[in-house]
């Protein structure tokens, strides 16, 4: 995802996660548990206890750069937050304190870094950012989320199985907030909300909230296409369409006139059925502060011939990367991918198995349905829904494969789909190292 900081909202994380951040060099904002409510004296004593326990446990993790000592989005309470700040400083005075605010004011504010959850529209309905406050480090702790830019409330549910036009807006909103955050050196940084879908009863669909640029299985959605392109092409060239190449009922004319492609390459050439359709350059006029702005193209296309799309990416005159997409579902297939080819049989080690419906080139197929039925042979167990219904998750799903404690050997997992046939993947379970 090419991010350099993560906000652990709104509770301290497992130490294994912080260990991984230390190893990866991923900066961490860690904060105490809670959301808005700050209760009475006894409740506040518990919040103070949480600050002390968090700092004591995690202060030796070099990845941590901010202690969140406020209850997320809570009203100011100088008496409480003076105590929590002093508690953190007494245990670790090397790091600043902060906590997300919904008030754009330093009245009765006590922390070191002003962190603002900014959900408002600019006059044109795009992402708005409040001006920095003078005299204090100013940080955006949240933006985008499910906020309805150009409207009211938090109603944008970026479901992979939902409205396609809305899905396509998510990446643009994230691009806008980072472009505008980079426009003023007085902004210390931007953390957009959020990385992953999560369970919730507020603003949710079937018990899941959908502000994540990846789904609950950690599989990137269209919204992640902006982030995936923000990397030096010498490290990893990227071409990520912010659309599905599909001509079904939801998108009969294909991606449409305002189609977006995120890439870190200098020039894109689009071929439809081997005919040159467009030559594109990044839109630096609309996104002047992004290192790798998006590309825009008219892709309102007659889909009756089930055309193929090829996107060639260039640096100068050198072809760096080419990606192809098929509109013909007859060649679709079921894809299985595991994160790890080997796991330890220590009773807890597991790996993710992702299954998805893709076209013949491996691109995701919009609104693919049907059930995936899994079977397993060997010293392992399936953790998750089986069979798995793909329709509700937009043709993508996942389970976890855990090795049985103390057992070693080859684990074979077979996935069966009524129209796409079966696929097989293997994992090796090894006994733990002594």
Regions inferred by a protein language model and the residue ranges of each:
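Low-complexity "stalk/linker" and mucin-like segments enriched in Ser/Thr/Pro/Ala/Gly
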Residues: 285-290, 378-396
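Short, hydrophobic beta-strand segments
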Residues: 295-303, 388, 393-406
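Substrate-binding/catalytic cleft of secreted carbohydrate-active enzymes
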Residues: 5-252, 257, 283
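Catalytic cores of secreted or luminal carbohydrate-active enzymes
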Residues: 192, 197-199, 204-254, 258-335, ...
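Beta-strand-rich structural segments
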Residues: 257-263, 337, 348-366, 372, ...
């Amino acid at each position: 995802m090419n991010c350099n900081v993560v906000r652990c909202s709104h509770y301290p994380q497992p130490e294994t996660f912080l260990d991984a951040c230390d190893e990866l060099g991923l900066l961490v904002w860690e904060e105490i548990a809670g959301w808005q409510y700050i209760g009475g004296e006894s409740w506040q004593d518990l919040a103070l206890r949480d600050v002390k326990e968090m700092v004591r446990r995690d202060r030796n993790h070099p990845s941590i750069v901010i202690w969140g000592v406020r209850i997320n989005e809570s009203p100011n309470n100088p008496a409480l937050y003076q105590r929590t700040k002093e508690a953190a400083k007494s245990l670790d005075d090397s790091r600043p304190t902060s906590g997300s605010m919904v008030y754009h004011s330093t009245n009765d504010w006590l922390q070191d870094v002003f962190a603002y959850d900014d959900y408002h529209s600019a006059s044109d309905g795009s992402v708005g950012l409040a001006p920095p406050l003078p005299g204090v480090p100013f940080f955006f702790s949240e933006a985008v989320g499910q906020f309805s830019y150009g409207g009211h409330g938090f109603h944008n549910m970026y479901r992979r199985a939902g409205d396609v036009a809305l899905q396509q807006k998510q990446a643009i909103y994230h691009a806008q907030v980072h472009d505008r955050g980079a426009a003023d050196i007085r902004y210390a940084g931007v953390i957009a909300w959020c990385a992953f879908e999560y369970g919730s009863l507020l603003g949710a669909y079937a018990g899941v909230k959908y502000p994540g640029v990846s789904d609950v299985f950690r599989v990137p959605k269209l919204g992640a296409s902006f982030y995936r392109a923000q990397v030096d092409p010498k490290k990893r060239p990227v071409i990520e369409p912010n659309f599905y190449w599909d001509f079904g009922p939801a998108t009969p004319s294909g991606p449409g006139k305002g189609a977006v492609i995120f890439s870190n390459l200098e020039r894109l050439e689009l071929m439809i059925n081997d005919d040159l359709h467009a030559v594109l350059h990044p839109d630096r006029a609309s996104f002047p502060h992004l290192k790798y702005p998006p590309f825009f193209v008219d892709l309102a296309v007659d889909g009756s011939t089930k055309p193929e799309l090829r996107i060639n990416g260039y640096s100068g005159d050198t072809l760096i990367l080419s990606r192809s997409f098929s509109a013909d579902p007859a060649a679709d297939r079921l894809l299985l991918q595991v994160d790890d080819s080997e796991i330890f049989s220590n009773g807890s080690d597991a790996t993710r198995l992702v299954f998805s419906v893709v076209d013949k080139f491996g691109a995701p197929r919009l609104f693919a349905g049907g059930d995936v039925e899994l079977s397993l042979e060997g010293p392992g167990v399936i953790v998750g829904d089986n069979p798995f219904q793909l329709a509700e998750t937009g043709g993508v799903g996942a389970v976890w494969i855990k090795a049985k404690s103390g057992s070693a050997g080859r684990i074979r997992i077979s996935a069966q789909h009524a129209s796409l046939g079966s696929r097989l993947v293997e994992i090796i379970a090894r006994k733990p190292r002594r």
